[in-house]
């Protein structure tokens, strides 16, 4: 029954604007293909394991990406512009904060990476934030200039994915370069994809709550979901040439059942319809995004994603039936 109900909800004219979808695909392809200049500044007192881990993660044969390595030993290195990401491997030097300040002045997103639990200049990001940065006076004292805590990442080199926290930082803070970074570097790919899903789901929840005219929210929600799918496809290496426009549109069509659930529940609960629409817009977008991540991370294509999203729509429809709840 849930399957047939989802299919009925999927019928009708698509609210997706193909012209806007075309522009979204062009924008995503451009963002994914952009050249990258990445600076790795290595404090000479940093641990060998940390240095090797960062070098292995950031090296790439991709001709669109240039990795520039430099040492922090006494004098501050010169950071050439443009720079899309500056990673500082921290050791015992307190001058790493000044390197971050130089990078931010380019401007470029900059992060200090330290080993979790190691006794260098700090054992935690909180201690590092209090210590690093500032300038040396003639008497050798330092002028306090703490680095923001969100610019420091502590990594566990014994973990199965030691740079997972760095990947989370890239997803939050790398700005316009994050799609290209995620496409070329596996350590941050899933984190960037999940952040795209989170932001799109929150955006669509707001649309569902605020747009009260029946059906007026559908084109906006649909386009946001299409953009999300396109971006996730791009960072997982799916081709985004315009010959795939119809494929993307067909994939998004598989999510009409997700959006239909919101309409049905809003009609059934008129007093709470605005809240239900927002909640289901959020849940439907999350389900769609997770299906895309799972599909592409396992080597799937846009063609196979359509079936996965249809299954997600049917599952959400089943959970929304009276007397049922979310699957455990």
Where are these regions (language model features)?
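Conserved G1/Walker A P-loop phosphate-binding module
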Residues: 3-72, 290
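Structural motif
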Residues: 40-46, 87-93, 114-117
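Canonical P-loop GTPase G-domain recognition
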Residues: 50, 67-72, 119-180
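A short, well-structured beta->alpha microelement
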Residues: 55-84, 90-97
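Amphipathic helical hotspot of TIR/SEFIR-family domains
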Residues: 95-108
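Active-site helix-to-loop segments that bind/position phosphate- or nucleotide-bearing substrates
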Residues: 175-192, 196
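Membrane-inserting effector segments that mediate pore formation, membrane fusion
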Residues: 194-290
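Charge-biased C-terminal accessory regions appended to nucleic-acid-, cytoskeletal NTPase
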Residues: 276-328
């Amino acid at each position: 029954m849930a399957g047939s109900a989802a299919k009925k909800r999927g019928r009708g004219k698509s609210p997706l604007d193909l012209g806007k979808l075309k522009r979204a695909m062009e924008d995503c392809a451009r963002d994914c293909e952009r050249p990258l200049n990445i600076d790795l500044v290595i404090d000479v007192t940093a641990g060998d394991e940390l240095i090797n881990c960062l070098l292995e993660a950031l090296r790439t044969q991709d001709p669109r990406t240039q990795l520039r390595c430099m040492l922090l030993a006494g004098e501050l290195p010169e950071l050439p512009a443009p720079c899309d990401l500056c990673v500082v491997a921290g050791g015992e030097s307190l001058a790493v904060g000044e390197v971050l300040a130089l990078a931010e002045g380019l401007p470029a997103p900059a992060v200090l990476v330290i080993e979790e639990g190691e006794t260098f200049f700090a054992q935690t990001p909180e201690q590092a934030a209090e210590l690093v940065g500032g300038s040396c006076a003639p008497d050798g004292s330092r002028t306090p200039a703490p680095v923001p805590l969100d610019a420091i990442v502590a990594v566990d080199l014994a973990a199965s994915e030691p740079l997972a926290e760095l990947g989370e930082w890239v997803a939050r803070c790398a700005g316009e370069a994050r799609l290209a970074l995620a496409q070329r570097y596996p350590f941050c790919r899933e984190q960037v994809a999940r952040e795209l899903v989170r932001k799109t789901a929150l955006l669509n929840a707001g649309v569902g709550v605020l747009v009260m005219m029946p059906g007026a929210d559908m084109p906006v929600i649909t386009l946001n979901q299409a953009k999300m799918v396109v971006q996730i496809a791009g960072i997982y290496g799916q081709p985004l040439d315009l010959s795939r426009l119809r494929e993307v549109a067909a994939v998004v069509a598989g999510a009409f059942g997700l959006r239909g659930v919101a309409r049905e529940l809003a009609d059934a609960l008129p007093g709470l319809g605005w809240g239900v629409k927002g909640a289901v817009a959020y849940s439907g977008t999350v389900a769609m995004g997770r299906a895309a991540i799972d599909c592409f991370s396992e080597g799937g294509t846009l063609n196979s994603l359509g079936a996965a999203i249809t299954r997600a729509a049917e599952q959400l429809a089943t959970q929304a039936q009276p007397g049922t709840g979310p699957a455990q």
